């Protein structure tokens, strides 16, 4: 039987765990389940903290997405819960009187991840060493300078600077010199449809995602999923979940099963929008380095101008739908995000939703990171992050353009024929509505292939360090 593509397998749930073979899996809200003492071996559920039929259906679906058995998958209450469970179950227990568990993580982290790592450090549960993981030589130097590394925490592209981490190369290096080091990948920015770090050669130990983002896609639930390389790893993590009650609720599990069914079509449109928008920002709006202002830049892994374009393409099926740009001015960026002209773009944190979101990370998602630390890590204070939804791309560009004009960043000239960037003096043809009749094969312009519709199996070429 031929292997089905991933956007097909997440649609079909079958009739698993339903005696009536319903076409849509039911939601089991029951807290407890009757026990048959004469047939205890046949008892799958007793208490929903330990397991629930609806959660099992979800874990089965995620297992199909990542090509692993259902028992390797665990669903929890949020993405941060997922990371907390992973660290408690696999890393913190390595602590002894003579050793504090050591974690190497990136320097462009989600604020919540930074907060959790700081908490463990303050409580002396673990030591976090931050390095630019997109620079392999820096990572290698830091890794070799430490006596023992218990965990490496990776994310690519990084959020929100969109830096590409060479995950395959880091995995080969770490597993070659320190096989016992646990390598964890936060795959939220890509989702299992675009990347499967478990199937790299060698694969990572654990992947997790905030299911609040792409997997659900509607921002009407909070959830997280953990996908382990082996059942043995999953068993350790399940112990933490069962002990603490961190499992995802039945209703949220049911909503997530439903959201997963449209992952393929949602992500296709979101990535298409992101590609067109990034090209428009860089070329028509002039957010690229110029002689008068080298601080302006568009950051997106789907742009050929991105130096890591080929690297990202080598182990991912698509670019995702998160991009960011720098205006070159903190005040102008703040005016843009605060503009009352925005009617489609919602000013809020998070990403992966069907509606488009806009934010200023230094004031929102990354506000919990100390300003001095942001400066030390070269985090641009004027950075504006865009998370594309599924709306019509022309409407998205018009809405953003109106806000940029209102913020005194862009001036529309000659009855809309040209766009003039007031901050870096770039003048370019206005292509705001040019994409109205372009075919949906915009992927081919960037990658020379239709990424979402191609076979989802990655062909990873092994190479030496």
From Swiss-Prot:
Pfam families: Cys_Met_Meta_PP. Its EC number is 4.4.1.13. It catalyses: L,L-cystathionine + H2O = L-homocysteine + pyruvate + NH4(+); an S-substituted L-cysteine + H2O = a thiol + pyruvate + NH4(+). Coiled coil: none annotated. Keywords: Amino-acid biosynthesis, Cytoplasm, Lyase, Methionine biosynthesis, Nucleus, Pyridoxal phosphate. The modification N6-(pyridoxal phosphate)lysine is found at residue 213. GO terms for cellular component: cytoplasm; nucleus; peroxisome. NCBIfam families: cysta_beta_ly_E (TIGR01329). PANTHER family: CYSTATHIONINE BETA-LYASE, TRANS-SULFURATION ENZYME FAMILY MEMBER. This is Cystathionine beta-lyase. It comes from Saccharomyces cerevisiae (strain ATCC 204508 / S288c) (Baker's yeast). The gene is STR3.
């Amino acid at each position: 039987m031929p292997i089905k593509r991933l956007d097909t397998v997440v649609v079909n749930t079958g009739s698993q765990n339903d005696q009536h073979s319903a076409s849509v899996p039911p939601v089991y809200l029951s807290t407890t389940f009757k026990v048959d003492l004469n047939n205890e071996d046949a008892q799958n559920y007793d208490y929903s903290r330990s397991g629930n039929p609806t959660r099992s259906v979800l874990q089965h679906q995620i297992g199909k997405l990542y090509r692993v058995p259902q028992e390797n998958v665990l669903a929890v209450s949020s993405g941060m819960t997922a990371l907390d469970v992973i660290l408690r179950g696999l890393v913190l227990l390595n602590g002894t009187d003579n050793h504090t568990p050591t974690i190497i993580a990136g320097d462009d982290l989600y604020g919540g991840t930074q907060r959790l790592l700081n908490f463990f450090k303050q409580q002396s549960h673990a030591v976090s060493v931050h390095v630019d993981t997109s620079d392999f030589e820096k990572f290698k130097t830091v890794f070799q300078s430490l006596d023992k590394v218990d965990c490496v925490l990776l994310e690519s592209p990084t959020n929100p600077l969109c830096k590409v981490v060479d995950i395959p190369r880091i995995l080969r290096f770490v597993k070659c010199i320190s096989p016992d080091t646990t390598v964890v990948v936060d795959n939220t920015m890509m989702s299992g449809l675009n990347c499967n770090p478990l199937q790299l050669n060698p694969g990572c130990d654990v992947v997790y995602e905030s299911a609040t983002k792409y997997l659900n896609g509607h921002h009407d639930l909070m959830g997280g999923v953990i996908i382990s390389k082996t059942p043995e790893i999953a068993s350790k993590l399940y112990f933490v979940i069962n002990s603490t009650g961190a499992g995802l609720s039945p209703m949220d599990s049911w909503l997530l099963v439903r959201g997963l069914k449209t992952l393929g079509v949602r992500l296709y449109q979101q990535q298409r929008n992101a590609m067109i928008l990034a090209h428009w920002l860089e070329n028509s709006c002039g957010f690229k380095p110029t002689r008068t202002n080298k601080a302006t830049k568009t950051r997106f892994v789907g742009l050929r101008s991105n130096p890591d374009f080929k690297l990202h393409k080598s182990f991912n099926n698509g670019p995702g739908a998160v991009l960011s740009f720098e205006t070159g001015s903190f005040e102008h960026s703040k005016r843009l995000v605060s503009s009352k002209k925005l009617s489609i773009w919602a000013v809020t944190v998070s990403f992966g939703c069907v509606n488009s979101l806009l934010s200023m990370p230094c004031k929102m998602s990354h506000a919990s990171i100390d300003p001095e630390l942001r400066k030390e890590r070269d985090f641009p204070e004027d950075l504006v992050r865009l998370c594309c939804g599924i709306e019509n791309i022309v409407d998205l560009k018009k809405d953003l353009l109106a806000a940029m004009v209102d913020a005194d960043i862009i001036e529309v000239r000659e009855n809309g024929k040209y766009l003039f960037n007031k901050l870096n003096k770039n003048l370019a043809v206005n292509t705001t509505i040019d994409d109205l009749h372009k075919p949906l094969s915009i992927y081919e312009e960037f990658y020379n292939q239709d990424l979402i519709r191609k076979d989802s199996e990655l062909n990873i070429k092994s190479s030496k360090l």
